[in-house]
């Protein structure tokens, strides 16, 4: 491994920036992290373009941390910017980047891809699907609960990151001219308003400039860092880990608590994994090791050198690192970089919401595709404006990036701990690692995560409660929806009958047949849906052709066309159809009918009637049924409200509304 690392470093130092010379470096990078150099993204020019795109999406959050991270290390703990403290904190920052990002995420977590996709819900689905222990159902339930809580915490992070990033960028105006101070908050709100208004138009057109802008940003970070380090080369002592250890030992509790601010340098780590499906592992690793990491280390060390020479610069070392003539351009570039970072996070929250809907943890909501080419380009109005309200509230309440830093970090540390736990399960169950190997590697990561989490706990009374409360609310909603749907499914199944029994009854007592085709949607592919039984009971008539359609979501991101549709003709002109989708896909009725047509089952859309059940949930007071794990009455009422306000299947599955019949069903839970 070390020989490959040396080859990689030598290739970087001796290669000129052309594709032919860089390709061996890419191959060495794959070898260091144990990746097969498969045909995926083999072309070097494609890898470079994807790496550039990854800069604009994946590294926005972690790339804007220099705006506030080092400043916050000295802001709340009574630590003076003495040479010993500066070198010690820089050492902690450097080794946090190495251990948390380079080793944990780049070398191990990125391996845990779910058919190429990443993210905490994708990892949860992979961990659940991989369970092979004796007590499978219990362990699957545990992994699901842990994963849901991790996803819920990321919603809290998604609201704080835009607020703290843009505020910290705008605060640079006070160095340009102190009279700008009263306008910081109004300008931040203006930028946020424009950002969230822009979402409905999508980012397909302007997204192409995100990568180049972030490349300029990282280049400027590196140049500013070199400028600062040139004035005091003693900062290179921070590369030695014993300085960080001595800092922790010499400063006691204050030294431990400063880890809460040190963690701010890696708050964008989850994005590396979440966006793996968009860019692939190689481009993300390439962008990190060749661009983002060097630029970040140079800038943090440059800020440290500035503090060694001028401790008074601790009030804003990032902007004071720049020459005075460059302050205004730096504020403008910082604002663009933080807007791009915020955009990436908003898109990430949209993606998590879509996955949660498909996996059955969230009610159906209106999802608008903003690009005909990119499946990931979506806009969810209710999520967008909920985030907007939350961000504006944070800006008006906390007012400065330093105040917001007190609320930042604890939710992300919780999510990173959960990622470690889920990755451990994948290593044990899917990769077949021994308990000793899995525990040694991921146990070490968990100790690191717990240290950061413990250092952030003290933030709870000072604003850290905000992301935790947001996460708790989202977690409550997701688990209530999941549990409520399970109870509803059981109630509907009680009213159903096996499709084989139903067909035998049709053969014995043939009903009147109406011309045309009827497609009944059902949650259970093996039972007859209540609307069909209702129709037979009251109307005693059946369409000439009847299909019972069930849409199932698998624990994989995408389902191949070959496995999309399963069709069985139970008896002549009575079909059972199962449409399989991944959690990254959104089912559409026209696509399902087209897949049926390719199987020689032609449903003419204009002559087809779609029959759906419309459940009215009645929250029943009293004890649960014997042997059934139900919900508290207030959660049953909450589920009833969520069900009532969920988007109707007609709109969600894009079914022609003038061909839909909805049959009302009252269900007590």
UniProtKB/Swiss-Prot annotation:
<dbReference type="GO" id="GO:0005886">
    <property type="term" value="C:plasma membrane"/>
</dbReference>
<dbReference type="GO" id="GO:0015293">
    <property type="term" value="F:symporter activity"/>
</dbReference>
<feature type="transmembrane region" description="Helical">
    <location>
        <begin position="206"/>
        <end position="226"/>
    </location>
</feature>
<protein>
    <recommendedName>
        <fullName>Probable potassium transport system protein Kup</fullName>
    </recommendedName>
</protein>
<dbReference type="Pfam" id="PF22776">
    <property type="entry name" value="K_trans_C"/>
</dbReference>
<keyword id="KW-0630">Potassium</keyword>
<keyword id="KW-0406">Ion transport</keyword>
<feature type="transmembrane region" description="Helical">
    <location>
        <begin position="47"/>
        <end position="67"/>
    </location>
</feature>
<feature type="transmembrane region" description="Helical">
    <location>
        <begin position="288"/>
        <end position="308"/>
    </location>
</feature>
<dbReference type="Pfam" id="PF02705">
    <property type="entry name" value="K_trans"/>
</dbReference>
<dbReference type="InterPro" id="IPR023051">
    <property type="entry name" value="Kup"/>
</dbReference>
<feature type="transmembrane region" description="Helical">
    <location>
        <begin position="86"/>
        <end position="106"/>
    </location>
</feature>
<keyword id="KW-0472">Membrane</keyword>
<keyword id="KW-0813">Transport</keyword>
<feature type="transmembrane region" description="Helical">
    <location>
        <begin position="326"/>
        <end position="346"/>
    </location>
</feature>
<feature type="transmembrane region" description="Helical">
    <location>
        <begin position="252"/>
        <end position="272"/>
    </location>
</feature>
<keyword id="KW-0812">Transmembrane</keyword>
<comment type="similarity">
    <text>Belongs to the HAK/KUP transporter (TC 2.A.72) family.</text>
</comment>
<dbReference type="InterPro" id="IPR003855">
    <property type="entry name" value="K+_transporter"/>
</dbReference>
<keyword id="KW-0997">Cell inner membrane</keyword>
<feature type="transmembrane region" description="Helical">
    <location>
        <begin position="378"/>
        <end position="398"/>
    </location>
</feature>
<keyword id="KW-0769">Symport</keyword>
<dbReference type="GO" id="GO:0015079">
    <property type="term" value="F:potassium ion transmembrane transporter activity"/>
</dbReference>
<dbReference type="InterPro" id="IPR053952">
    <property type="entry name" value="K_trans_C"/>
</dbReference>
<feature type="transmembrane region" description="Helical">
    <location>
        <begin position="144"/>
        <end position="164"/>
    </location>
</feature>
<feature type="transmembrane region" description="Helical">
    <location>
        <begin position="172"/>
        <end position="192"/>
    </location>
</feature>
<keyword id="KW-1003">Cell membrane</keyword>
<feature type="transmembrane region" description="Helical">
    <location>
        <begin position="404"/>
        <end position="424"/>
    </location>
</feature>
<dbReference type="InterPro" id="IPR053951">
    <property type="entry name" value="K_trans_N"/>
</dbReference>
<feature type="transmembrane region" description="Helical">
    <location>
        <begin position="435"/>
        <end position="455"/>
    </location>
</feature>
<keyword id="KW-0633">Potassium transport</keyword>
<comment type="function">
    <text>Transport of potassium into the cell. Likely operates as a K(+):H(+) symporter.</text>
</comment>
<keyword id="KW-1133">Transmembrane helix</keyword>
<feature type="transmembrane region" description="Helical">
    <location>
        <begin position="460"/>
        <end position="480"/>
    </location>
</feature>
